[in-house]
């Protein structure tokens, strides 16, 4: 009789864990960010079981290009700023996709939305001066917003647009340092 009771309890606990654990992230294209790789790439948990990630995907933020980590000091600063923006969202973001959903390297391409205040994180990186505009058709849904955000940060001299700002665009830096990529 006791064994039956314990088996039943364990089964109920297992079912509760299974039901409350999102199988395909959270509803409404919401995902937990598990890692920030640099100022424009994160990892999200897309499948989990009882809170443990089973599948993680890399997401490249559409429309922006942040300095590379080896572009001192702006690469590290961009990564730190993206972490700050994600922490304001409790590391849970809504991911919106555009027409092309993956890049040549297999990363997902997405717009990250702060679930708490509704801000577009890609746009905030531009507006705060930690990334440059980097749009490629057909993924241009928010390109007008991004152009205006970069103009605002540039005119205010924020981040990479300040006195000791970025000396080289990230794309140009990658071209001149192919050994790192």
Model-derived segments and spans:
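Small beta-barrel nucleic-acid-binding modules, primarily SNase/OB-fold domains
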Residues: 2-14, 19-181
């Amino acid at each position: 009789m006791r064994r039956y009771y314990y088996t039943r309890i364990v089964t109920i606990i297992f079912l509760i864990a299974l039901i409350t654990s999102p199988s395909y992230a959270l509803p409404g294209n919401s995902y937990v960010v598990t890692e920030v790789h640099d100022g424009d790439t994160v990892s999200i948990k897309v499948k989990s079981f009882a809170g443990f990630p089973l599948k993680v995907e890399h997401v490249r933020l559409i429309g922006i290009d942040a300095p590379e980590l080896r572009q001192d000091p702006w690469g590290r600063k961009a990564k730190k700023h993206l972490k700050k923006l994600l922490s304001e969202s409790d590391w849970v973001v809504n991911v919106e996709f555009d027409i092309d959903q993956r890049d040549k390297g297999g990363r997902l391409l997405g717009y990250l939305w702060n679930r708490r205040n509704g801000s577009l994180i890609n746009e905030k990186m531009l507006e705060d001066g930690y990334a440059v505009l980097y749009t490629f058709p057909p993924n241009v849904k928010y390109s007008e917003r991004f152009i205006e955000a970069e103009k605002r940060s540039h005119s205010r001299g924020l981040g990479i647009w300040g006195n000791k700002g970025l000396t080289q665009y990230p794309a140009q830096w990658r071209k001149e340092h192919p050994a790192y990529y």
